Amino acid sequence: MKNAFKDALKAGRPQIGLWLGLANSYSAELLAGAGFDWLLIDGEHAPNNVQTVLTQLQAIAPYPSQPVVRPSWNDPVQIKQLLDVGAQTLLIPMVQNADEARNAVAATRYPPAGIRGVGSALARASRWNRIPEYLHLANDAMCVLVQIETREAMSNLASILDVDGIDGVFIGPADLSADMGFAGNPQHPEVQAAIENAIVQIRAAGKAPGILMANEALAKRYLELGALFVAVGVDTTLLARGAEALAARFGVEKKLSGASGVY
């Protein structure tokens, strides 16, 4: 068994990604052909469940883009279900300390290395027990990315990085900026300093730093600092802004207004 995304991170090859929030296999397949290295299927803030994640994994599978799945929480039951339908790389949200990071890793490993329940006869991941030695190969194919997005998590970063089985650490700029008192403004100098310091620290520890940043200049800055998996846009934002721009070119007055948002 292989995990091309995990292999790329280990080799130090920067991976450029796109966030998927439309919760739809048709749009997921459309974007899988766009050329991004990875696509994040979001189960935390988008209206996804195990079934919709499954259909998006199936839609992306024929393409070179690698799927990364974010569950709604660091929940071993939910993680087990996502792994069984074929997710190999998980982005675990709101990890605050080393114990929570260890719990995330344990949820992705079969015993005795972890607590993942054995149900391979029912699992797409094992091709319903058609992959020889799946139970003995699966642990090494798992890629665990933990998300730090508060001052508490930042203060515990060194101990999180010491946890065996953590492949990468993703900085959540929206929640981090809110926790630091700058909600909606991840470009605030204090937030940027925290992000940049974390990227350098993560890379120095031999782990892969990651982030979502739609600001092109900042995304490139993070890559220069050593970030290895950077999502540079969100499908919902691309669709909304693209549709608005097209309407505006034909003189259609925008009916709704609002904040531009973080992404």
Curated annotation (Swiss-Prot):
**GO molecular function terms listed in the Swiss-Prot or TrEMBL record:** 4-hydroxy-2-ketopimelate aldolase activity; aldehyde-lyase activity; metal ion binding
Top-rank taxon, per record: Bacteria
EC number(s) for this protein? 4.1.2.52
> Keywords assigned by UniProt?
Aromatic hydrocarbons catabolism, Lyase, Metal-binding
Give the record's cofactor note, including how many are bound: Binds 1 divalent metal cation per subunit.
General function of this protein: Catalyzes the reversible retro-aldol cleavage of 4-hydroxy-2-ketoheptane-1,7-dioate (HKHD) to pyruvate and succinic semialdehyde.
Annotated protein name in UniProt: 4-hydroxy-2-oxo-heptane-1,7-dioate aldolase
Instruction: Name the source organism.
Output: Salmonella typhimurium (strain LT2 / SGSC1412 / ATCC 700720)
